[in-house]
Amino acid sequence: MAGLFDQSLKLKAKWKIKTKADRGGDVVIDRIVRAARELVEDQGLRMADIRAIGLGVPGVVIKGRVFNAYNLHWDEVAIQSILRRRLRVPVFVDNDCNLFTLGIHRVELKGKPQNMVGAFLGTGFGGGVILNGELFRGHNYAAGEFGQMTIDKNGLKTAHSFRGSLESLASRTGIVRHLRKAVLEGEE
């Protein structure tokens, strides 16, 4: 999903497009570029009118590089520099759950409480951590990667997580996989 905001962070327009990640990581990048351009053009603007682009992505983000975003077929992708080059606009990239937690903390909760945890269930299972009023990134920038914690060392392994990880059990993808397995095995 792409959104166009004014300087006071008011949403002016949004545009939704499927990533088509099953076609590969380069296709995902092409679709992000397309979404940004079409959203801007639909508003009668040019990319030169845009001050900056913010991008939230799954996986660990270190200095504009995305690591372990396996559902997008990205590992060690320099997404920030790729998008800057293709869109000719400053680009800022961070983990999607970090940004969501930070947004809730700063905008919805007006900076209170000083400490909080956001947990987000979707294709994966991620989160963000606010400590002393600031986003806490932790070791290797992975403080909110809750989905990678091992819950059941004998559990299922998925294509995008470790065996028995929280994500393999409790993400939308994991829940569907477990339900499908139970139905196929005749469990009630």
Q: What is each model feature region?
A:
Residues 3-16, 23-27, 86, 92-94, ...:
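Glycine/GP-enriched mid-protein hinge/lid loop-to-helix segment characteristic of carbohydrate kinases
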Residues 11-13, 59-62:
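Short, basic/glycine-rich phosphate-binding loops at helix/coil junctions
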Residues 2-3, 65:
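Short, glycine/acidic-enriched capping/hinge loops at junctions between secondary-structure elements
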Residues 56-57, 70, 121, 171:
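A secondary-structure boundary/capping signal
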Residues 44-47, 188:
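Short helix/loop segment immediately N-terminal to the Walker
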Residues 21, 25-37, 41, 48-53, ...:
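Glycine-rich phosphate-binding loop and adjoining helix at the ATP-binding site
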